[in-house]
Amino acid sequence: RSSDLHLVVNWGSGPQQMWAITNPTSGKPKSNIWMLPETINSFFFRPGFTWSRRSAKGLSFRALPVDCVFSDKGPTVFCADDETDELLSLMAILNSSAFELLVSLQMAVGSYEAGVILRTPVPTLSHDQKSRLAQLVLRAWSLKKRLDAAVETSHAFLLPAALCKSPKDCDAEIVAAEVAKIQAEIDATALGLYGFVAGDLEANSD
C-alpha cells in the first residue's frame, strides 16, 4: 500500500537547504544521508519500497513512489532497472510470512535493521512467478485504494462512502477478506520457493 506523503522537502535548489540544518554540537547536517552524493545522484526520486527500522506492529514493506527522498530512519529497497514487475514481486516476497520468519531468526522483535534485510536470502523467481506475484500486489493495492477513495482526508478520495456505486467497494470487511486471500496465496508461494512447509511457521511461533 502506498501511504499519503505527509512530509515534503524544498528541493528547488537541490539539497542545500537540508545541508543547512545542522547539529549544533558537530556543525554537520543532522542526517548524514544528505552528505552522500552517490545516494542523492543514484537513488533519490526512484520508485522502490521502504520499511520502518523499528516497529511494534511487525515488519511491513510499503511502496515508495517516484519523486521521493528518504533518510536513514526509513531505509529503502530498489531494483536495478526500476522494472515494475521486479519491484512488485520482490515486495510480495518481502511481505511474506516466510521472509519475516527468516528475519526474526536474526534480530530482536521489533527491530529491522537494513543489514539484516540485505543479508536475508531472496528466492529466484521465474517469469510466471514474478508476473503472478506482481498481479497479486497490484490487486491488494487496488482494494486498499478502493477504501481510501471514500476517506475525505486521503489523496485517493473520490466520493463519500454513501455514494459508492457498489456497497462492497466501500465495505472494509469484504476488502479485508479479499486482501487476506491474496496474502495467503503470497505466503503459500513464498513457502514453496524457500522450501518450507506450513508447519515450519507454527513450529517457530511455538
Residue ranges and their predicted role:
Residues 121-206:
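Non-catalytic DNA-recognition/assembly elements of restriction-modification systems
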